[in-house]
Amino acid sequence: MSPSNVFIDSSVMVGLFIGDEKAHKLLSKLINDGFMLCINPIVFSETMFKVTFHIALEDGIRGVYDLKKNLNRYSWVYEEVREKIDKMIKMNYLKILDTNWEVLKLAPEIGKKYNLLTNDAIIIATCKYYRINKLATFDSDFEKVDFIEIIKE
């Protein structure tokens, strides 16, 4: 992949969907600077769940179990997130990278070396596999990875 790719963590994607100005400014800057935004299925899944959970908490849902019992009230979030991601793809701002077996084989080693949880290790493994050295994130856990440049603003 070219150096113009930047991987976008779910912390930034969630911010975009819940109206966080910092996330919006960061993504706008990256697009204006000519970067192609990249995510994987892990980030898609985390974004979908965290946006749904955030909205449910604002409505008074008390936790994951309560959300699960009332999930039908939030099914609209699935479509809204999917539509916005689809629009970003069609505008050629975003691409979804495959999480293949080669990526998954890298993840345990990366998780152990950098003390990362599973999803974060898969994200970093995706970056390594696709030779992406920039990660837009608000998550400080990634700062310990020595081959990734963290972009926060």
Swiss-Prot record:
Keywords: Hydrolase, Magnesium, Metal-binding, Nuclease, Plasmid, Toxin-antitoxin system. Mg(2+) binds at D9, D120. CDD domains: PIN_MjVapC2-VapC6_like. It comes from the Archaea. InterPro entries: PIN-like_dom_sf (IPR029060), PIN_dom (IPR002716), VapC_family (IPR022907). Residues 6-152 form the PINc domain. GO terms for molecular function: magnesium ion binding; RNA nuclease activity. Its cofactor is Mg(2+). It is an enzyme of class 3 (hydrolase). Pfam families: PIN (PF01850). Its EC number is 3.1.-.-. Belongs to the PINc/VapC protein family. HAMAP family: VapC_Nob1. Toxic component of a type II toxin-antitoxin (TA) system. An RNase. This is Ribonuclease VapC6. It comes from Methanocaldococcus jannaschii (strain ATCC 43067 / DSM 2661 / JAL-1 / JCM 10045 / NBRC 100440) (Methanococcus jannaschii). The lineage of its organism: Archaea, Methanobacteriati, Methanobacteriota, Methanomada group, Methanococci. The gene is vapC6.
